[in-house]
Structure formats: C-alpha cells, structure tokens
C-alpha cells in the first residue's frame, strides 16, 4: 500500500475542486486532486455548454418560424436532428478538451485518478493501493441525476439531462419530468426543434414570470 501525505486533499476535479486546489497552492500548501470519473466539469460536459448549444439551434429555428411576422420570409424550415446533435457534441467535446488540458497540466504527483473513500479522519483510500493522509479534505464531488424507482421499469426509455447530449439524433417525442430551470430549458429547446414535448410538474401554478413564459 502506497501512502501519500498532503496538507489538503481535494475530492473532485470539477469547477469547485479545481478552484479549491488552486487556492491551496496559492497559499503555499501541498494539495492533491482526486477524480474517479472522466475529467471535464459538469458545465463543460453535461451542463451549460452543451445545453446552450442546443438552445442556440432552437433559437435559430424559432427565429426562422417567427421571421414572417417581420416581413422576412425564409421559406419552410427543415431541421436536421442528426446535424444538430453532431454540432452539439463536437463543440461540447472542444470545450471539454480545454478543461482536460487544464487538469492534465497539474503535476502528476498531485493528481490521482480513482474513487476516494474515508477509512479514518484525515485518511482516504483511493482505489485499491493508495492511501492519502491530509490535514484537510475538500469534498467537491458534485451530484448526479437520480431516476425515481417507479420510472426505472421503463428501462432505456428513461434518460437524464446528462444523457440527452449523447444522442445521435433528436427524439420524436419526449416527456420532461420537472419544471425547474433544466427541465424548462431542455423542454423548450426540443419543442422548438420539432420534438413533441409533454411537461410534467408537481406545482399547479408557477409564479416566476420567466418560467411561466417558457411553459
């Protein structure tokens, strides 16, 4: 068993973890960055970057639909779902590449790839053969979407907001469960791109004006 000692161990190499690591180094302390999954922040890989790319395509389609009202007649709008998603993934991967480069620029002695767990206060087990001793531990693991048990019986037909950007083509129809920011953004974008969208929400009335307009 290999034992490594640092002033601070940071679990998670996303935006928060990277910021914590840099802050520790800026104060002259030793730090290690631990990541069990692929490098690339939530924003770049499955969050704001790919979602805004999908929204940009949706806004282009929506603008073309609304153009006749301004005296501009572009003709029938044809949406190529495969081309839309190919561009989303291509640009997303480019953004992720910048993040990966940033992580990989860190001294290899100060970054570990593996899942960490506490075995005692100030002691982490990383993978099968590394222990990390640290005076302080920053937990910046983020979160993952959860599928309710009653929906898991639908198998592969159920996807999360993380999965939508891996599709090769736009779906013909989709049921969006949840009217939060993510659900509304994706639901509106897909609807503007020709997807039949049904929105399911627990609240009867939404008072926030922007969300009302989106619905």
Where do the PLM segments sit?
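Glycine-rich flavin
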Residues: 3-6, 22-29, 34-170, 203, ...
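Rossmann-like NAD(P)H-binding beta-loop-alpha module
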Residues: 169-199
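Cofactor-binding loop segments of dinucleotide-utilizing enzymes, especially the Rossmann-like FAD-
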Residues: 13, 36, 179, 202
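Glycine/Thr-rich phosphate-binding loops of Rossmann-like dinucleotide-binding domains
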Residues: 19, 147-149, 185-186, 215
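N-terminal Rossmann-like FAD-binding beta1-loop-alpha1 element of flavoenzymes
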Residues: 8-32, 185-191
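Residue-level detector of conserved catalytic or cofactor/ligand-binding positions
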Residues: 201-215
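Beta1/beta-strand and adjacent pyrophosphate-binding region of the FAD-binding site
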Residues: 2-14, 172-177
């Amino acid at each position: 068993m290999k034992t490594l000692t640092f002033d601070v161990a940071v679990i998670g190499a996303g935006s928060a973890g990277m910021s914590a690591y840099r802050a520790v180094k800026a104060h002259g302390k030793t730090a290690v960055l631990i990541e069990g999954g692929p490098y690339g922040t939530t924003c770049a890989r499955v969050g704001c970057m790919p979602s805004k790319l999908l929204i940009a395509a949706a806004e282009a389609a929506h603008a073309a639909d609304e153009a006749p009202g301004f005296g501009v007649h572009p003709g029938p709008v044809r949406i190529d779902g495969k081309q839309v998603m190919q561009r989303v993934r291509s640009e997303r991967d480019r953004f992720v590449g910048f993040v990966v480069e940033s992580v990989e620029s860190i001294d290899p002695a100060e970054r570990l790839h593996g899942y960490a767990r506490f075995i005692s206060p100030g002691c982490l087990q990383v993978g099968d053969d590394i222990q990390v001793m640290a005076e302080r531990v920053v937990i910046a693991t983020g979160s993952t979407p959860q599928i309710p048990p009653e929906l898991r019986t639908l198998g592969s037909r159920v996807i999360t907001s993380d999965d939508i950007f891996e599709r090769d083509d736009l779906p013909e129809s989709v049921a969006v469960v949840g009217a939060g920011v993510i659900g509304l953004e994706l639901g509106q974008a897909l609807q503007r791109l020709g997807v039949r969208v049904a929105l399911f929400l627990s609240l009867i009335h939404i008072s926030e004006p922007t969300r009302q307009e989106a619905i």
